[in-house]
Amino acid sequence: LRGRRGTPAVLGRFRYGREWESVTVKEVATVPLPQGGDPSWALVFPSDYGTGISNLGLHYVYYQLKRLGVGVERFFHSPIPNISVESHRPLQDFPIITASIAYEPDALNFLELLSLAGIPPRRKQRDTGAHPLIGAAGAFSSINPSMLLAIADFIVMGDGEPVIPFLVESLRKYSREVDREKLLKALDEHPSILVPGLGEEKALDTLARGEKRGAVTPAGQSVGHGIWVTPNSAFGDTLLLELQRGCMRGCPYCVLPACFSPLRQRPLEMVLDALDRCSSRVPFSQVGLVTPEAGDYPGLDVLLDRIESLGKGVSFASLRIDNLTPRMVKSLRDSGRESLTIAPETGSDSLRKCCGKPFTNGQILDKLEMARMEGMKKVKLYFMVGLPGETDEDVLAIASLAGAIRKGLHMGVSLSVNTFVPKPGTPWGNQPFVGIKEAERRYQCLKRAIAENLGKSFEARFSSPREADLEYRLSWAGPEAVDWMETLVEKRKRGKNNAI
């Protein structure tokens, strides 16, 4: 066994252990964390540490496993792959490995981690006696579990909290059995656990008949806040505070209504209590409100008042412009922010209405004028290109809207432009993907319009159509995708990241 760059495993464990310690020393737990012990369990978030430590799902699963006495340890794709955060053991030492896969590319990262650890990514190539049991969960496992059938022994669909006690009990009861099939049959009894380890065809048939459905955590039954606060998270020194799951909006491009319904809002009293308890226990500079749309949460103003009274700043995971109020803008300004982030999706009023956002460019300008009067100086706008029914005029309207904001309101403006990817289970799931070449053509049309109307130095970031194509392929892939996924992982390992 060798670590990175050929470092002997013992020395590598010491070296990378010290690196992890330099990261974890800045983690402050908001609740007491039990030691845990049995079984030994690798909890993998196949993305970078900053992203993973900002994911409330990872916090919740880790804490619940700890409370059940499980010896759970965290792994991330970077900066130190395949070495656990807690004890600095290699991934292959753990008999149980579960991955929380939030986004499509993370599935590739997980395959890469398994491969680097010497664990065959394909389930059929793993020896039940010599290799760990592999599970998958997370948002992507609910969006497209079919793609994971050739990889995972079992797949948890929906929220993890209602499933974990059953999962732990079953693993403790059957994990020492020589015949793993008894364990897999036990797991298959749960309505939210899909078990491809009993056969891919059976699992596909189960999905087609709708016999397995995502588990749902009732409002108020989750922890409701982050387990750690660390400056190394994607949000900085922030306490994550959950307000709701699911969404009432039903935008046709979004997976939330289809895969993560129903809407569940945490009672305001519970949210306030969690905030007060955490603020009395650990230091943090701001509160991150975790919700699909903060403006839909009842009692938001009361919560913002409480956050302000504690001397904390606030950040919103999402802001819908038609929900934006002076009170919300004031909270951002009082937190030291001068920039606002919104997602008009398109510059066309009619196309935006089709997207489930029936507000006009005029209403956007009115709301931003209010925000400017409240102290906001800049706005970042998110758009999609390749939407169903989109014309070149719709694409050019993005530049027109940006120009109207900058010239009419004298605000700083930046754009983030992404390629629309149809997702399974959504109303627009059956719409065609625009394709790499056409996305690039529309990007060029928009770039020319921006240069002509706003100047070549105007700040606009365009996501890669090639990456969107990969996301689309993974979103709709079946178990056969493991063939080209493995090929891509091997090319990545050889440094050929752009080869698909």
Question: Model-derived features: where do they sit?
Answer:
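Flexible loop/turn segments at secondary-structure boundaries
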Residues: 49-52, 63, 81-82, 105-107, ...
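Flexible glycine/acidic-rich beta-alpha junction loops that bind and position SAM and/or redox cofactors
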Residues: 298, 327-328, 350-355, 385-393, ...
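N-terminal [4Fe-4S]-dependent radical SAM core
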Residues: 14-42, 49-50, 194-240
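Conserved SAM/AdoMet-binding glycine-rich loop
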Residues: 43-46, 96, 105, 273-414
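Canonical Radical SAM [4Fe-4S] cluster-binding loop centered on the CxxxCxxC motif
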Residues: 55, 232-269
